Amino acid sequence: MTRTAVLLLTLLFLVAMAASDKIKTRELCWTEEECENWE
């Protein structure tokens, strides 16, 4: 695998993790800005 492919897969993985974290912690967020600070 090329380094570019590895970077793309890593980015996709991080985005997926961030999305699942948002779903899990959505009720803990008061505002959209605080939600983004969870990352």
Swiss-Prot record:
It is found in: Secreted. Disulfide bonds join C29-C35. It comes from the Eukaryota. GO terms for molecular function: toxin activity. One of its GO terms (cellular component) is extracellular region. Keywords: Disulfide bond, Neurotoxin, Secreted, Signal, Toxin. Expressed by the venom duct. The keyword Magnesium does not apply. Residues 1-20 form the signal peptide. The cysteine framework is C-C. Probable neurotoxin. This is Contryphan-Cal2. It comes from Californiconus californicus (California cone).
